[in-house]
Regions:
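Conserved blade-ending motifs and adjacent loop-strand segments that build the rim/top face
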Residues: 245, 363-384
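Bacterial N-terminal signal peptides that target proteins for export
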Residues: 1-11
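Short loop/turn segments immediately following beta-strands, especially the blade-tip
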Residues: 144-153, 212-222, 276-287, 357-363, ...
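C-terminal motif of bacterial Sec signal peptides marking the signal peptidase cleavage site
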Residues: 18-20
Length: 404
């Protein structure tokens, strides 16, 4: 049966609408943003927590925030996406509206403005990308350009990159990230409904239920990289990088190694973290991996058919353990994290406690509770320094700071 994500709030909080029009708004108002302050969730970890390595510093409160990102090399700016279709810029203790596309964004079900990503050459080309769910339910990637100063979006700069029709209210995916190879990666859900009724995840002719890898063109649209694993295969979409995914809502690249880690939201019993090791830090992982859905849910057999050479997850969290919708995170890389440096931090929408583990192709070591809790944890984010943030749909954006 269909997992009751709506009860956990994500279904009614993560819907974004997109239209094919190319105009954009850049907003004008600005106001003072709160300075970072200790959050109650960070200063008072849950009793019995296995580690007390971080505290949570509140960056600010927002209207249903969904993600945090920063341009490469820019330590002065952080950007927060809000579900309704706005991007808020944080700079020098103040906030301003960087983009407002709320008229395009569907906000029911698991929709909304879900993430953003900055082009590796953003400092010179000012190109950035957003992932949202359009008013007709389509999964949409749009490109915009910032002004030369980088504090607003250029009016009329919007260009459609990719649009994928989606038939149902759930499993909308939502993540955008540029990999170490300079290509744009996006995670698309399987099309929704219980058990992948359309069998999209194992179908190489469909983009739903996939991780895709594309090279966005400056004027809109995209190229398919020649190195993608299914380029030239009859009946397969060349954009596909990995398949067999249910709802890859959050994924990230390790900024030190290039390894790719995917949080794939489960169905009835199992939430999973998938790990794709990098060939090199500069190239990222090799493509073509089958992650098993809907033949497998985690390591457990789920549906009919076969999943050739599928790769099992490195972490499983069951619903019996209090999980309901896993939220993939980031590998902690700044030296300031001390003993936690090199650990992967992740969480879950229902079980709000943060967790850490050391990941490799062989599995996970030391998977444990970190201590602080974040209610309605919908995302993690990373700034230009590699510092990691937790995002609560209740409004809080919190930086994970070393304790002591």
């Amino acid at each position: 049966m269909k997992r009751a994500v709506a009860v956990a709030t994500i279904c009614c909080s993560l819907t974004f609408a997109v239209s094919a029009c190319a105009s954009s708004g850049d907003g004008s108002g600005s106001q003072t943003a709160g300075r970072e302050a200790a959050s109650p969730g960070g200063s008072a970890p849950q009793a019995g927590a296995a580690a007390k390595g971080v505290r949570l510093l509140r960056v600010g409160s927002f209207d249903e925030p969904t993600y945090l990102a920063a341009p490469p090399g820019d330590r002065a700016r952080r950007f927060v996406t809000e579900r309704e279709g706005r991007i808020v810029l944080l700079r020098k203790g103040r906030r301003s509206t960087f983009l407002d596309i709320s008229s395009r964004v569907e906000t029911g079900g698991e929709s909304g403005l879900l993430s953003m990503a900055f082009h590796p050459g953003y400092r010179s080309n000012r190109r950035y990308f957003v992932y949202y769910v359009a008013n007709d339910g389509a999964l949409t990637i749009f490109q915009f350009r910032a002004t030369a100063a980088g504090n607003a979006t250029r009016k009329g700069s919007g260009r459609l990159v990719l649009r994928v029709p989606h038939p149902r209210f759930n499993h909308k995916g939502g993540q955008l990230q540029f990999g170490p190879d300079g290509m744009l990666y996006a995670g698309f859900g399987d099309g929704g409904g219980g058990g992948d009724p359309d069998r999209n995840a194992q179908d190489l002719g469909e983009l739903l239920g996939k991780l895709v890898r594309i090279d966005p063109k400056p004027g809109g649209g995209y190229r398919i990289p020649r190195g993608n694993p299914f380029v030239g295969r009859s009946g397969a979409r060349g954009e596909i990088f990995a398949y067999g995914l249910r709802n890859p809502y959050r994924f990230s690249f390790d900024r030190a190694t290039g390894d790719l880690t995917i949080g794939d939201v489960g169905q009835d019993e199992v939430e999973e973290i998938d790990f794709l090791p990098a060939v090199s830090a500069a190239s990222g992982p090799r493509g073509g991996t089958n992650l098993g859905w809907s033949v497998f849910e985690g390591n457990r057999r789920f549906g009919a058919g076969s999943a050739p050479a599928h790769v099992a997850p490195v972490i499983e969290r069951t619903h019996d353990q209090g999980s309901c919708s896993i939220t993939g995170g980031y590998v902690l890389r700044p030296r300031s994290y001390g003993a936690l440096r090199g650990s992967y931090v992740y969480g879950d929408l229902c079980d709000s406690g943060l967790r850490v583990a050391r990941l490799s192709s062989g599995g996970a070591r030391g998977d444990r509770a970190l201590g602080p809790s974040v209610p309605q944890l919908v995302s993690f984010g990373e700034d230009a320094r590699g510092r990691v943030y937790a995002v609560s749909l209740e409004g809080g954006v919190l930086r994970l700071a070393p304790r002591g």
